[in-house]
C-alpha cells in the first residue's frame, strides 16, 4: 500500500539553528476518501528563494532592516487574487508574506513568533477555501497577522495595536474575513461548531475551519467542544497547530519551558508513530473484506495498535468523534493544499481534525533560537533582533509581586504558587527558579487552577493563584463555589488590572473588583504603589481563615521606597489611610487610581484649593470609619478607580446610603471606567478616553463645586 508521507524540513534564513528533536515521517490518512497516493519524495528544504540567495545569517537579517521587495505579495490584496497562482508562486508568496510580517512587527511590536509559524498554513487555507464565505477562525488570534495581510489590511499594518488602528487579534467589526473575535484561548472549536450547526439549519454549504494551538488545547472548553462536535456530527474542520508551546513562553528565564500536561506527551508520540499508521491501514483493509467475529478482532487490533504505540493521542480525538489526520508538516504548502482540498471535497464525514506540526518563529533566526520564540515583542531591529525597550528606573508590578512572594516563601514553606501557562507573564518563573517544587503551571486551565488551589488550601498550604484579571473570569464559578463558599484561604493575585494598552479590551482587567467584591467571604484589596503591593502580599499570606485577592496594574512601579528584601508587613484588614489633608473636597482613590488623585490634587491646588486624598486600600471590608470621616468633613467626595461600574465606588455608595451619609449636603461622584469596552491604544490615550486622567479628576472637582471656569481651564491647558 502506497502511503503519503510528511516530514518537517528546516527552512527560513540561512544560519538558522538546528531544531531540537526529530520529526519522524508519518502517514496522513484519509480512509473516507483516500488521498491520491504518490511516491515518497526525498526530504527537501522549503527554504525561501530570498533567503537561499543570502550566504550568511547576517546578510539574511540585514535584508529585513529595510522593507524587503515583495513583488508577488504586492499583487495580492485579497484571497481571490491567490487562486490562480502556481505552487511555486504560492511558496514565493509565503516567503514574501513572512518578510512582510517581520518588517511590520519590527515597527509596531506584537505577537511575532506565532504569526511566523503559520505563514504556509495561512497561505494554504486562503488558497483552498473561499473566504469569507468559508469561515476560518483563529484561536487566541496571536497568529493572525499573515491572515490580516492577505485579507485587505496590509496597508493598515503600520497601525497595528495603536490607537484607532488594527487590533492585534481577530475582530469581527474590523473585517468580514474575521469570522470570530478572539484574544482569549480555546474558544474557536465551540464557535466553529455553532457556525457549522447554524449553517446546517439554514441549508448552507460553506466550510468552517477552526485553527487552534496545542497550548489552547489544554483548556477544558476545547474538549467540551470536541465532545459536542462528535455528538452533533456536523461537518467542520479543526486544525491543531502543534508548535510544542503548550505553556505560553512569555519571558522565560532559563530557556524554553517544557510543554505542560499529558497532551504534549501524546502529541509527541503521534509525531513518531509510523508503525501505528501501518498497523491501522492493515486493520482497516481487513475490516473491509471480512465480517463477524473476525471483523471485531481486526478492529481490536486497530485499537490495540493505537493504545500500545501512540498512547492516547489519536484515540482521544477519535473517541470524541473527530476523524484524525496527521501529523502533517505545517511548512510544506504542497502537502497542506493536498490534504485541505481532499477534506474540503469530502462531505458528510462529520468533524475532522488535522494535526499540523509547525515551528514558532519560523524563518527568523533570532526568533527561532530565542527561549520565548519572540512570542510577544516590542519594536525591534530586524538586522540584530534587539528590541527597543526604554530603560526603566523601576521594576514592573509583576516583578515586585514575584519578589514579595519569594520573600514570603523564604520564611514559610507552606507558600505555593499556581499559574495558568503564564510563568513569565505573572513573574512566577522567578519563583519557580527559587522553589521548583512549590510552583505549579497547570496549562491554560484557569478553572482547574482555582480548584487545584482550593485543594492545596484544604491541606493546610498557602496557595497564591496568579492569573491575569481578564483570564480569571473563566474560573469565576470555581472562585465562588470551590473557594469562597467553603471559605478556603486561596490568595488571588490579579495581574493586568485596569487598562492594558495595546492588547485592548480582551485583556483589559476592568471587572475584577466588581466580580470579587460581591462575594461574602472575600477580602478585596488593591495597592497604590509597589511598596503597598509588597505589604498586600504579606497581608494575603497572613489571612488564613478566608480567601483574599489583590489587583495590580500592568507597567512599572512609581519609585517609592521598598521594604527590605521586598518582605512586606501585613496591613490591618479593612483600614485605609489619608495621604493629604485638605478641605471641602476629598478624593478617595482605590489601587492605581490613588496616583491619579495625587496628581489631580496638585492641579487643583494651583487654582487655590487644597483637597484631601485618601488611599482606600480595601474594597472589602471597607474602612467605614475613614469613609464617615471624609463624608462628614467635606462638601464633595469623589471615589476614583480604574475599574467598571459596580466596583469600589458602588460599595462606598451602598455603605453611605445605608449609613445616612447621603441624606445631607454631601455631593458624591464616582469616577470609573465607562460602561463600554475601550479599544486598544496607548495607555495615555485609553486613560483619557476613560476620563480618568488627573486633568479629568481635577475638572470634575471644580464642576461639582460649580466652578466651571476653572474646570474648563484645566481641560484646555491640562498642566495649567
From Swiss-Prot:
Gene3D superfamilies: 3.40.50.920, 3.40.50.970
Binding locations of thiamine diphosphate: 142, 183-185, 215-216, 243, 364, 446
GO cellular component: chloroplast; chloroplast stroma
CDD domains attached to this UniProt entry: TPP_DXS, TPP_PYR_DXS_TK_like
EC number: 2.2.1.7
Induction and repression of expression: By the mycorrhizal fungus G.intraradices colonization in roots.
Keyword Metal-binding (UniProt): yes
Pathway: Metabolic intermediate biosynthesis; 1-deoxy-D-xylulose 5-phosphate biosynthesis; 1-deoxy-D-xylulose 5-phosphate from D-glyceraldehyde 3-phosphate and pyruvate: step 1/1
Binding site for Mg(2+): 214, 243
Basic residues biased stretches: 35-46
Transit peptide (residue range): 1-51
Subcellular location: Plastid, Chloroplast stroma
Biased composition (Basic and acidic residues): 56-65
Entry keyword RNA-binding: no
Cofactor(s) the record lists: Mg(2+); thiamine diphosphate
Subunit structure as annotated in this protein's UniProt entry: Homodimer.
Entry similarity comment: Belongs to the transketolase family. DXPS subfamily.
NCBIfam families listed in its UniProt record: dxs, PRK05444.2-2
Record protein name field: 1-deoxy-D-xylulose-5-phosphate synthase 1, chloroplastic
Organism per entry: Oryza sativa subsp. japonica (Rice)
Amino acid at each position: 500500500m502506497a502511503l503519503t508521507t510528511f516530514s518537517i524540513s528546516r527552512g527560513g534564513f540561512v544560519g538558522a539553528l538546528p531544531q531540537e528533536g526529530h520529526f519522524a515521517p508519518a502517514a496522513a490518512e484519509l480512509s473516507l476518501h483516500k488521498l491520491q497516493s504518490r511516491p515518497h519524495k526525498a526530504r527537501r528544504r522549503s527554504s525561501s528563494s530570498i533567503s537561499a540567495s543570502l550566504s550568511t545569517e547576517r546578510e539574511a537579517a540585514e535584508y529585513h532592516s529595510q522593507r524587503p521587495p515583495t513583488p508577488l505579495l504586492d499583487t495580492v490584496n485579497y484571497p481571490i487574487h491567490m487562486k490562480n497562482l502556481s505552487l511555486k508562486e504560492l511558496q514565493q508568496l509565503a516567503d514574501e508574506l513572512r518578510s512582510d510580517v517581520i518588517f511590520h512587527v519590527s515597527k509596531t511590536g506584537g505577537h511575532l513568533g506565532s504569526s511566523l509559524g503559520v505563514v504556509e498554513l495561512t497561505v494554504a487555507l486562503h488558497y483552498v477555501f473561499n473566504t469569507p464565505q468559508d469561515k476560518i477562525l483563529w484561536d487566541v488570534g496571536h497568529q493572525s497577522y499573515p491572515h490580516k495581510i492577505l485579507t485587505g489590511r496590509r496597508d493598515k499594518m503600520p497601525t497595528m495595536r495603536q490607537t484607532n488602528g488594527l487590533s492585534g487579534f481577530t475582530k469581527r467589526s474590523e473585517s468580514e474575513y474575521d469570522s470570530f473575535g478572539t484574544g482569549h484561548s480555546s474558544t474557536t472549536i465551540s464557535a466553529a461548531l455553532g457556525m457549522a450547526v447554524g449553517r446546517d439549519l439554514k441549508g448552507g454549504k460553506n466550510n468552517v475551519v477552526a485553527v487552534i494551538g496545542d497550548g489552547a488545547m489544554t483548556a477544558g472548553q476545547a474538549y467540551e467542544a470536541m465532545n459536542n462536535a462528535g455528538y452533533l456530527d456536523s461537518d467542520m474542520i479543526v486544525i491543531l497547530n502543534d508548535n510544542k508551546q503548550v505553556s505560553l513562553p512569555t519571558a522565560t528565564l532559563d530557556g524554553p519551558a517544557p510543554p505542560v500536561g499529558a497532551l504534549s506527551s501524546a502529541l509527541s508520540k503521534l509525531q513518531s508513530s509510523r508503525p501505528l499508521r501501518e498497523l491501522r491501514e492493515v486493520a482497516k483493509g481487513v475490516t473491509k473484506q471480512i465480517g463477524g467475529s473476525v471483523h471485531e478482532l481486526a478492529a481490536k487490533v486497530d485499537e490495540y495498535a493505537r493504545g500500545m504505540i501512540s498512547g492516547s493521542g489519536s484515540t482521544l480525538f477519535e473517541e470524541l468523534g473527530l476523524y484524525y489526520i496527521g501529523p502533517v508538516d505545517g511548512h510544506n504548502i504542497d502537502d497542506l493544499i493536498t490534504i485541505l482540498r481532499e477534506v474540503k471535497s469530502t462531505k458528510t464525514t462529520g468533524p475532522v481534525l488535522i494535526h499540523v506540526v509547525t515551528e514558532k518563529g519560523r524563518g527568523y533566526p533570532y526568533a527561532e533560537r530565542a527561549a520565548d520564540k519572540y512570542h510577544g515583542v516590542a519594536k525591534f531591529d530586524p538586522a540584530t533582533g534587539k528590541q527597543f525597550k526604554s530603560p526603566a528606573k523601576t521594576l514592573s508590578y509583576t516583578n515586585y509581586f514575584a519578589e514579595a512572594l519569594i520573600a514570603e516563601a523564604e520564611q514559610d514553606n507552606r507558600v505555593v504558587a499556581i499559574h495558568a501557562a503564564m510563568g513569565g507573564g505573572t513573574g512566577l518563573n522567578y519563583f519557580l527558579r527559587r522553589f521548583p517544587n512549590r510552583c505549579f503551571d497547570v496549562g491554560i486551565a484557569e478553572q482547574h487552577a482555582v480548584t487545584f488551589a482550593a485543594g492545596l488550601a484544604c491541606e493546610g498550604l498557602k496557595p497564591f493563584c496568579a492569573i491575569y484579571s481578564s483570564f480569571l473570569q473563566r474560573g469565576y464559578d470555581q472562585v465562588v463555589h470551590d473557594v469562597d463558599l467553603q471559605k478556603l484561604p486561596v490568595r488571588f493575585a490579579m495581574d493586568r488590572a485596569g487598562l492594558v494598552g495595546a492588547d485592548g479590551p480582551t485583556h483589559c482587567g476592568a471587572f475584577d473588583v466588581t466580580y470579587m467584591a460581591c462575594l461574602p467571604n472575600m477580602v478585596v484589596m488593591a495597592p497604590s504603589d509597589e511598596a503597598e503591593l509588597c505589604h498586600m502580599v504579606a497581608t494575603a499570606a497572613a489571612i488564613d481563615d478566608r480567601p483574599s485577592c489583590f489587583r495590580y496594574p500592568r507597567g512599572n512601579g512609581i519609585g517609592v521606597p521598598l521594604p527590605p528584601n521586598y518582605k512586606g508587613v501585613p496591613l490591618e484588614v479593612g483600614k485605609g489611610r489619608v495621604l493629604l489633608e485638605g478641605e471641602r473636597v476629598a478624593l478617595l482613590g482605590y489601587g492605581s487610581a490613588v496616583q491619579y488623585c495625587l496628581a489631580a490634587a496638585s492641579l487643583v491646588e494651583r487654582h487655590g484649593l487644597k483637597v484631601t486624598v485618601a488611599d482606600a486600600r480595601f474594597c472589602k471590608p471597607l474602612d467605614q470609619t475613614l469613609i464617615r470621616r471624609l463624608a462628614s468633613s467635606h462638601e464633595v467626595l469623589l471615589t476614583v478607580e480604574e475599574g467598571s461600574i459596580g466596583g469600589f465606588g458602588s460599595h462606598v455608595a451602598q455603605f453611605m446610603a445605608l449609613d445616612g451619609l447621603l441624606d445631607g449636603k454631601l455631593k458624591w461622584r464616582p469616577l470609573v471606567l465607562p460602561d463600554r469596552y475601550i479599544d486598544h491604544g496607548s495607555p495615555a490615550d485609553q486613560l483619557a478616553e476613560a476620563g480618568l486622567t488627573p486633568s479629568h479628576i481635577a475638572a470634575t472637582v471644580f464642576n461639582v463645586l460649580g466652578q466651571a471656569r476653572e474646570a474648563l481651564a484645566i481641560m484646555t491647558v491640562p498642566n495649567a
